[in-house]
Amino acid sequence: MAGAGIAAGAGIALYGGVYPRSQMFGHTTCWTSARRKLAITFDDGPNPAITPKLLELLERYKAKATFFPVGKFVRACPELVKETAARGHLIGNHTETHPYLTFCGPDETREELRLCNEAIAEVLLERPRWFRPPFGFRNPWLGEIAQQHGLQTAMWSLIPGDWRVKPAEWLIGRMKPIAAHAQENSGQGKSNAEAGNTGKGDVLCLHDGNFRELNGDRTHTLKALEYWLPRWRDLGLEFVTMSEGTSG
């Protein structure tokens, strides 16, 4: 019986720390407030090899996005972070070194958020308001610590796995649910009320960098967005930041 209790407790903790929509370890945002608002987000940058091209692509379609850079890369590429914000995109906190927060104690968790906040504030002269945990992994004290730093936790409704080394065509296929959801909401498909997201829009998690190194190859992410942005636009989707997507 004791073993069963331990296993059950471990299962609950795993659910709370890994499942994106779990609110067990603090409130998380996985959807936008309106079905036509698509929040495209990028983790693990800035990336000198890809982020500038990505900014040009987003500009072409008048798309605003949210970037969650790693603090150590913010310090390495401050001008790129500054340019990203100057183009109207939102900058969030993705920790200083991209650890597995599941295995971090309160002090280490607090330091990871603090250092990344400071790195961003040094560049933009203001602290971020949004935070995304690396790998989406959380711990029991993260919610309170994020709140102490004035951070809201952003998760996602779709994460297609663009960190994997796969052809762009594979990633394009993995991003199909965004269009399917838009068509459902427009009445072209069946209602998705059973999914509990009626009237809500998607938060898409992509990666413009590789947390292990600068200049990581994310060409497939760029190509997939080149394919989908005009199609999403034609479906009537509005590309918004996390703050824009959760207001109103």
Where are these regions (language model features)?
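Hydrophobic alpha-helical topogenic segments used for membrane insertion/localization
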Residues: 1-16
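Active-site beta->alpha N-cap acidic-glycine motif
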Residues: 17-102, 108, 112, 119, ...
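A cross-family glycoside hydrolase active-site/sugar-binding cleft signature
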Residues: 41, 66-70, 92-94, 132-134, ...
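Conserved, mostly hydrophobic/aromatic
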Residues: 43, 58, 91-94, 116, ...
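Alpha-helical scaffold elements within enzyme catalytic domains, especially in hydrolases
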Residues: 57, 83, 145, 230-231
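Charged helix-capping and loop-helix junction motifs
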Residues: 108-113, 168-173, 218-225
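His/Asp/Glu-enriched short active-site or ligand-binding loop at hydrolase and phosphoryl-transfer sites
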Residues: 143-186, 192-196, 237-248
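Catalytic grooves of carbohydrate-active enzymes
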Residues: 179, 183, 196-243
